[in-house]
Amino acid sequence: MNGLLLHSVSYSGSWGQPILTLDEFIDKAADLGFDGVMLMAKRPHLSVLDYGPRECARLRQRITDRGMQKVCIAGYTNFTGDLAHPDIPNREFQIRHIAELARVAHDLGAGSIRVFTGYLEASTPFQRQWDTIVSSLREAADRAAEFDVVIGVQNHHDIAVDPDSLHDLVREVNHHHCRAMFDAWAPALQGLDIESAARKLGALTVHTTVANYSVRPQFRYLSSVVNYERLPARAQAVPMDEGFIDYPAFFKAMGEGGFEGTVAYEMCSPLLGGATLENLDRHAAGFLQYMRLGVVPPRDVRDKDQFSLR
């Protein structure tokens, strides 16, 4: 691992939590003791509409002055969006957006930009969607290369969300400036083997984003039968040492696979304990302790069958 970062989405108000300005967030990450920051590349944080060269220079100085060196940019893309209207050049819009993010990354001294693939469109053949993503990532990587920046594909959106497909995708793009940003939480929630996936993707991965969860069952009451209908389980974000994802095993396997990148902590869904600034800070500080002190969470095998959301 090459540095522990805090993701600014954690303090963006995205799910009802307190909102910090980007400057306030930089100070928060530094005060908590993080090595760097992962910056949400949209309002209310690092929007390309608001950050030109002068603004980026000021922000970079603030990050440096607070003793942090590592920066990763969190982009937001969906290359399969609105395929039903090919007259609108959405793919071009997004590639141009990534090019602008590459400029921002260069100005901030960041080496990588997180990107997403696409959500499945039921009305469009899968192969067409896959090919659109491959060609888009390849062109985006060309643009990023002009600024000596790497784009990293996170396993977040529907397409290539499983580890094998993510590996296939990055290999098919076949570009030095397109890598993986493989996370453990998605395959863990899918009930997949995160250790074998980590060994397979470790060398291709430049950054990973971390959160831990506990799975809560859900039911709907059916008065007609005086009983309950089981619904898909709910993933509750919890402190790192209380979740079911075995991060010590994950990072060990990532290292065996060749991972040497950065790690960011995100609070991107409602937290156990509520949406207060104090609770956010407590979770973030707990992540640092968990990672730096090598805290290994106890494994409760009794709940093993509940780990998957399938």
Segments (PLM) and residue ranges:
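H/E-rich (His + Asp/Glu) clusters that bind or coordinate divalent metals
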Residues: 250, 262-263
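Acidic/histidine-rich catalytic cores of soluble enzymes
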Residues: 3-4, 8, 37, 135-244, ...
